[in-house]
């Protein structure tokens, strides 16, 4: 696949593009939506300078910071998520690299969440090959490490971690036989070509991502992008085109509509489902930011006749 071929797919008439994406989606997945819950298990004081992130220690934001939560409180959240219908419990920690003093505790938490009957996913920053192997042994199913944007635009967003470092972490995850969860963020001021190049980078990862989060910027006061923009710099039709193109390029990946969904109309979310989305974060909170409410999600899924994969088990 070349950059030009990706452009040609994206540029098709919208109805034709959505139809092809929907046909591919139905062939591989059918009518189910994966419900995932996301918990911030360590919040704030991150040494990274990601310009979109309120958890960066470089910026003055209003988030409530805390160290790694205790195991019992995390397990209680996981049980609640399962009872609410989630299939996967994702845990995020604001680290550039997991501290040695916390590694064993995180591994133990993964094992106990797995024992609840949930799929496990973590995002802990960079990990080396040995750490990836130990997380696999603990029962980890997915490791999230987003590319965020194209290689070319990346230095405009982050300077404390090189793009190639992200690729190396994904290589370590894949070599440990952990499923790769990797996507990006739209609406940070990037060009269309940057979005196409992000897709090309995802195609060229050491292992094909089994899960692709598609985020739109949530401008948060105190962050450089939050102070620059009041809304994500992408319209609904561009988002739907991007999702449909992603579905065509990744027919067997779960595409997750992630950050920014709270600000989308039900009609826009419906188009996203038609274009290939088959996973959402379910719950009123998304790390430090509000998410679409459980009630609104239940209403929309019922309105569209979509079933969660928990209901189909």
Swiss-Prot record:
Q: Which GO MF terms does the UniProt record name?
A: 2 iron, 2 sulfur cluster binding; 4 iron, 4 sulfur cluster binding; biotin synthase activity; iron ion binding
Annotated [4Fe-4S] cluster binding lies at 46, 50, 53
Its required cofactor(s), as named, are: [4Fe-4S] cluster; [2Fe-2S] cluster
Enzyme Commission number(s) from the entry: 2.8.1.6
SMART domains attached to this UniProt entry? BATS, Elp3
Question: What reaction does this enzyme carry out catalytically?
Answer: (4R,5S)-dethiobiotin + (sulfur carrier)-SH + 2 reduced [2Fe-2S]-[ferredoxin] + 2 S-adenosyl-L-methionine = (sulfur carrier)-H + biotin + 2 5'-deoxyadenosine + 2 L-methionine + 2 oxidized [2Fe-2S]-[ferredoxin]
Q: How is the cofactor bound?
A: Binds 1 [4Fe-4S] cluster. The cluster is coordinated with 3 cysteines and an exchangeable S-adenosyl-L-methionine. Binds 1 [2Fe-2S] cluster. The cluster is coordinated with 3 cysteines and 1 arginine.
* Assigned keywords, A-Z: 2Fe-2S, 4Fe-4S, Biotin biosynthesis, Iron, Iron-sulfur, Metal-binding, S-adenosyl-L-methionine, Transferase
Q: Which domain of life is it from?
A: Bacteria
Please report the stretch or stretches of sequence annotated as the Radical SAM core domain.
28-258
Identify the metabolic or biological route this protein is part of. Cofactor biosynthesis; biotin biosynthesis; biotin from 7,8-diaminononanoate: step 2/2
Q: Which InterPro entries match?
A: Aldolase_TIM (IPR013785), BATS_dom (IPR010722), Biotin_synth/BioAB (IPR002684), Biotin_synthase (IPR024177), Elp3/MiaA/NifB-like_rSAM (IPR006638), rSAM (IPR007197)
Q: Which residues are [2Fe-2S] cluster-binding?
A: 90, 121, 181, 256
Share an example GO biological-process annotation for this protein: biotin biosynthetic process
Q: Which family does it belong to?
A: Belongs to the radical SAM superfamily. Biotin synthase family.
Task: Please give the NCBIfam families that the UniProt record associates with this protein.
Answer: bioB (TIGR00433)
**What is this protein's function?**
Catalyzes the conversion of dethiobiotin (DTB) to biotin by the insertion of a sulfur atom into dethiobiotin via a radical-based mechanism.
Subunit structure, per the record? Homodimer.
The name on file for this protein is Biotin synthase
UniProt source species = Francisella tularensis subsp. tularensis (strain SCHU S4 / Schu 4)
What gene is this protein translated from?
Answer: bioB
